[in-house]
Amino acid sequence: MQVSDFHFDLPDELIARYPQSERTASRLLQLNGNTGAVKDGSFKDVLELVQAGDLVVFNNTRVIPARMFGRKESGGKLEVLVERMLDEKRFLAHVRSSKSPKPGTLVFLGEEDQYSAEMVARQDALFELHLKADKTILEVLEEIGHMPLPPYIDRPDEDADKERYQTVYNQKPGAVAAPTAGLHFDNQLLEQIKAKGAEFAYVTLHVGAGTFQPVKVDNILEHHMHSEYAEVPQEVVDAIKATKARGGRVIAVGTTSVRSLESAAQESLKNGTELMPFFGDTEIFIFPGYQYQLVDCLITNFHLPESTLIMLVSAFAGYDHTMNAYQHAVANQYRFFSYGDAMFIEKKTQ
């Protein structure tokens, strides 16, 4: 398939630049992957859609305030977007400046040069930096960092984003983009779903800035997926096995939860074992033709045209059904991308 097969026209005004006043106030488009039928509703409908005995899988990563502003030794301005923390002092980052800093030079971070870091080496599009401070990189980010809003939101971050560009159940710092399907859940809705008899499980996938990188090839088979760190612990494996045994469904909240679970499934298949825990980097690229191993239903936001994520959804619900649902969403003025509306999709099994 060609990347252009996943194009759709999106009016600029449908890109959500701010969240709704309440997390659960977003709209929800239901899609049946077998029939292609769509149904308009509100996100609170999730409470009716999740059944007793189902397992809802969330990504508990925490978005770090990964964007820092500073300057080079020469005085030129720069912007640093942390991609991954290697340890408490060393990190990989995207660096934007008029001229790339050279290895061995210092950069000063913060509005008032509060901190400095040494440029250690360049790794493709990323730079390895070493923080010169008696604090950890996480502590420095919490002090001077900005929330790394996606480029299409096209505005500076605001104080409210520290709360709203973060799920209420986040636990493990490391993401530089939010697992956005989870942004729609508040604590009340979570409690109501649990009270129905559904179970919860938590995976971790630290979403990288690569999630916003455009696909730069024409043939999707030639695309090389960016790497992200994921964890599927033993208790999640046990919960999935128990759910399948009782006839319940595995409902993944977000494409990052899907990619975590399916990474564990693929690794186990490769090793010829039953489902095992997974800890490590994943480059899993899911597109039409992929056979899902674990996930039965998917809650997800609306994704960018020609992105790997709309390809993942197309593999889940069927290409035609997905593209038709997106046309319906555009025609009915759904809000798109990170702060936008959501879908509840039942997997295509026929």
UniProtKB/Swiss-Prot annotation:
Domain of life: Bacteria
Short name of any one Pfam family annotated for the protein: Queuosine_synth
A biological process from GO: queuosine biosynthetic process
UniProt GO molecular function: S-adenosylmethionine:tRNA ribosyltransferase-isomerase activity
Broad class of enzyme this protein falls into: transferase
Catalysed reactions listed for this entry: 7-aminomethyl-7-carbaguanosine(34) in tRNA + S-adenosyl-L-methionine = epoxyqueuosine(34) in tRNA + adenine + L-methionine + 2 H(+)
Transmembrane segments: none
Listed EC numbers: 2.4.99.17
Alphabetic keyword roster: Cytoplasm, Queuosine biosynthesis, S-adenosyl-L-methionine, Transferase
Pathway assigned to this chain's UniProt record: tRNA modification; tRNA-queuosine biosynthesis
Chief localisation class: cytoplasm
A Gene Ontology cellular-component term: cytoplasm
Subcellular location: Cytoplasm
Subunit details: Monomer.
Role summary: Transfers and isomerizes the ribose moiety from AdoMet to the 7-aminomethyl group of 7-deazaguanine (preQ1-tRNA) to give epoxyqueuosine (oQ-tRNA).
Family assignment from sequence similarity: Belongs to the QueA family.
Protein name: S-adenosylmethionine:tRNA ribosyltransferase-isomerase
Taxonomic lineage: Bacteria, Pseudomonadati, Pseudomonadota, Gammaproteobacteria, Vibrionales
